[in-house]
Design a protein with these regions (language model features):
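Multi-pass alpha-helical membrane architecture of UbiA-family
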Residues: 1-312
Length: 312
């Protein structure tokens, strides 16, 4: 099996959703904890970015490989997905498991090179990825679970850097009798979760009939078309609110970018019946959302560090 087939198997283009938020998490943590560091710290801080990317690519590949393995029976029953690698036989289960092991290795090696906290918490995304394919068998909240999986992208990158300073307190919030609260990364991660949830609810419209026939609990299969549209718009407004509340570095760039992309996403959803290819348009606009927000973060003044709220 060649590189092209492997990239198709893991749908490499979907990495464009998570990658900008991985970078956003890294940039926020770097600006918060290391912007004023002396030059002796810069080399290993930049190496952190390399290992974060290795871990992120591994996590993304593992998530998709596990999804394909666990969902192969569902894929076989759906005309849209019946041509996928494991269903069609173009890839063996043995190869799929080997790829999963390689991606897991990338995740663990990247986390190991970062710090103890990153390595010890690597089980969390793995568990989330294993659970996700089963959620659609039992609840229409499966879309939210997928959103939470993607919400780990900025949170994981941020923790990987923050743990170099605060250790386990970057997660627990407890350090030396003080309670640490990091609102910016919390609301950005929550915003990502809601953004992906809104996208996935609309993405699932393609499989409504198949999902109903095969007992798959997607939101559009459970509820009406009108409710699906209304809910996805409400989720879009909620993710905009989360990004607005996060207010990284108190500048207008991020708020403006979030506002622009939320309007674009709502516009596409409302025009669904008038677009020649709603799914492709929604995919492009949703994918662009993360990159526009990343550009906004880059344009901000890095000296305006994100605040950490400390309570005794």
């Amino acid at each position: 099996m060649g590189t092209k087939e492997i990239l198709e198997f893991v749908k490499i283009e979907h990495t464009l959703f998570s990658l900008p938020f991985v970078l956003i998490g890294y940039i926020l943590a770097y600006n918060q904890f290391f912007y004023e560091s002396d030059s002796s710290n810069l080399e290993w801080i930049r190496m952190d970015l390399l290992w974060i990317l290795v871990a992120a690519v591994g996590a993304r590949g593992l998530a998709m490989a596990l999804n394909r393995i666990i969902d192969r029976d569902i894929d076989a029953a759906n005309p849209r997905t019946s041509g996928r690698h494991l269903v069609s036989g173009s890839m063996s289960m043995n190869t799929a498991w080997k790829l999963s092991a390689i991606f897991l290795g990338m995740l663990l090696i990247g986390a190991w090179q970062l710090n103890e906290v990153a390595l010890m918490m690597a089980w969390l995304p793995v568990l989330a990825f294993i659970i996700y394919p089963y959620t659609k068998r039992y609840t229409w909240l499966c879309h939210l679970w997928l959103g939470l999986c993607l919400g780990l992208a900025p949170a994981g990158a941020w923790v990987a850097v923050a743990a170099d300073v605060h250790g386990w307190a970057a997660i627990t919030g407890l350090e030396g009798g003080d309670y640490l609260w990091f609102p910016t990364i919390f609301f950005i991660s929550l915003g990502v979760a809601l953004w992906i949830t809104a996208f996935d609810i609309n993405y699932a419209r393609m499989d409504v009939e198949s999902d109903r026939e095969n007992g798959i609990n997607s939101f559009p299969a459970r509820f009406s078309d009108e409710i699906t549209t209304r809910t996805s718009i409400q989720l879009t407004l909620l993710w905009f609110a989360c990004f607005a509340i996060s207010d990284p570095m108190s500048e207008i760039w991020f708020l403006g970018a979030a506002g622009l992309m939320s309007i674009a996403n709502v516009g596409v959803i409302l025009m669904r019946n008038r677009l020649n290819d709603f799914q492709s348009t929604l995919f492009r606009v949703s994918m662009l959302t993360g990159w526009v927000l990343l550009l906004a973060i880059i344009l901000m003044d890095p000296s305006a560090n994100v605040d950490t709220i400390i309570e005794g």
